[in-house]
Amino acid sequence: MSRSPLHPIPLLSEGYQDTPAPLPPLLPPLQNPSSRSWASRVFGPSTWGLSCLLALQHFLVLASLLWASHLLLLHGLPPGGLSYPPAQLLASSFFSCGLSTVLQTWMGSRLPLIQAPSLEFLIPALVLTNQKLPLTTKTPGNASLSLPLCSLTRSCHGLELWNTSLREVSGAVVVSGLLQGTIGLLGVPGRVFPYCGPLVLAPSLVVAGLSAHKEVAQFCSAHWGLALLLILLMVVCSQHLGSCQIPLCSWRPSSTSTHICIPVFRLLSVLAPVACVWFISAFVGTSVIPLQLSEPSDAPWFWLPHPGEWEWPLLTPRALAAGISMALAASTSSLGCYALCGQLLRLSPPPPHACSRGLSLEGLGSVLAGLLGSPLGTASSFPNVGTVSLFQTGSRRVAHLVGLFCMGLGLSPRLAQLFTSIPLPVLGGVLGVTQAVVLSAGFSSFHLADIDSGRNVFIVGFSIFMALLLPRWLREAPVLLNTGWSPLDMFLRSLLAEPIFLAGLLGFLLENTISGTRAERGLGQRLPTSFTAQEIQMLQQSRRKAAQEYGLPLPIKNLCSCIPQPLHCLCPMPEDSGDEGGSSKTGERADLLPNSGESYSTASREGVRSQ
């Protein structure tokens, strides 16, 4: 009985639930054959087992990010500082993140993006709580040692303020969700995108990768040996052994079966290292988690999250100011995350209607999180996008499964409490590797522009340096900003401490105020003024594919005709289908860019910008 030879089969997404397969390049001659693409690939049929395996690893990254955010926000919480178990607060965040993820992948941006709390929500929350709750002080002899002032008694005056402070943070999250949803409903991304080139996106991604280095170092410092072991295992599995193909067992008859080889090490580059280091950490007992957050509590086994479970969010002028800064920073971060995910999956750039829907549903998720009492909103997760790059595959089915996992775990606070035992070195190692991928993706975007230009060198350097300098200055300034009005102080301190927003804002202003040619800015050097018939066909095919991948699902698409005119920015336009334009004869060249290259369409500009 002869057996078919072993050979790897590229994993292409099939069916409605899977992520789009990689699109062909806009112009074949411009493709660099020597470059290694970060294409979305699936090895063999996308089985449910493989999807569950990938979803479990994305869930581990999400759980690490979620638990790290709660640790940073509640690290000064005295025993008894909350009127409910901290595990219940974590379960509420799991539920809101899961529901937001399902909505985002179903009718939002349609990209396989996981929704999670981001640094853009954490920074204003820390500013809001620290300004109102000075529960920690620094000892004269050791500037790095923080002592809780109210850890020995539950009758301290500051303890009853914790619930009020967290209610105020939840109110800020609700405000941010409402504002972010409004930004999406008004179609702001479609109006801003034509003015955003590689010199706006690249600094934002670089700063996004660097912005969490302090928190990552804090988690890794709990045990540098375990953290370095985790990082080493993740790098070896995803990079050094990433191309090792292992045959997948098949239950079909050998005469008709095709033996599929899959890169097991790359597909397990998160689960295997995390499980190994978690086991070692439990064996040696190095998990250093605050007792008030990890001790066994009376959290229920089953709990149905609903608004007003503890108390309703508190809306104050300071919460309003913090919520505005959250919305501006989270919107900037999410738009960069959309572009990064499309770049890693080798897709066409997300169209304005997909970005508008994505921001609208992220705002809805943040409103839901705030109403459920969560102190952190939901936004597209950069660490999970970095995980997509490690796996080199992305799937909407995987994102749906992650959302369902989170919603199921959010119904059981007792099960959610299990993830409070994640060791700190694991948190630091996972976030460190995934953030490094985001950083490298930002650097890879510089090649689209003329990086040797003095104009571009100044824009890149100034945007990145000032985005990292201003938050550091605010954090260590001897005198805080004091305008005499507390809400304005809160707004300035929160917004100026958001590095991703600062990088995007500075890059946007400098890019559009300093004169430069389109080729110098990276907006037109790859787009010729005329195309052959074959190139026209490929361009139309690419547009049709983009319309298929970013378009609304059929039940929702049929309702577009009933949507009021001001909300038509959420629906695909007729020209997005790619059917416009006549056919050309073989060898004929058609001018798609009349009036020279200075006036080509927004879609073409975005296509060039994301290549």
Curated annotation (Swiss-Prot):
Key word Transmembrane helix present: yes
Residues that span the membrane, as ranges: 53-73, 89-109, 169-189, 192-212, 216-236, 270-290, 320-340, 359-379, 398-417, 427-449, 456-475, 490-510
Cytoplasmic membrane side: 1-52, 110-168, 213-215, 291-319, 380-397, 450-455, 511-611
One cellular component (GO) term of this entry: cytoplasm
Primary localization: membrane
Alphabetically ordered keywords of this record: Cytoplasm, Membrane, Transmembrane, Transmembrane helix
Pfam families: Xan_ur_permease
A GO molecular function held by the record: transmembrane transporter activity
Record-stated family: Belongs to the nucleobase:cation symporter-2 (NCS2) (TC 2.A.40) family.
General function of this protein: Acts as a sodium-dependent hypoxanthine transporter. May show xanthine-hypoxanthine exchange activity.
Protein name listed in UniProt: Solute carrier family 23 member 3
Organism: Mus musculus
